[in-house]
Amino acid sequence: MLRIVLAVIAGYLAMAVLVFATFTGAYLAMGTEGAFRPGSFDVSTLWIVVSVILSFIAALAGGWVCTLVGRRRAAAVALAAVVVVLGLAVAAMEFTHSGEQVPAARSGEISNFDAMQMAQQPTWLTLLNPFLGAAGVLLGARFRKAE
């Protein structure tokens, strides 16, 4: 049981580190104007596509790491459940606090930190992310098993 708990933690940390690193790199590569729609904090279509791809890759890696540490598929299933539960909890918080502290208009360049805080993504993406993440985790676990 302890191995599964440690595997879930390791897999989740791998996902978090990859998401932070790749999203930071993507934002720096795209710049403010590439990541957001003109004059707003609504994310651009390009950002949506890139973020879905990067999130799925991070989930694959998380599932792979989780299975490496846990040595059983049960660890990846537990991580997938954690991803869905936490993802839906974050979505619920976003819906209850939607747009409270985000200025309506954006002008000029903004820092990576401010971009993370103020980005407004579509509702459908907020709801899709937990399930896409869980699918990536389970598929990543299968990659580990195939080796």
Locate each region found by the language model.
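Juxtamembrane/disordered regions of integral membrane proteins
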Residues: 1-147
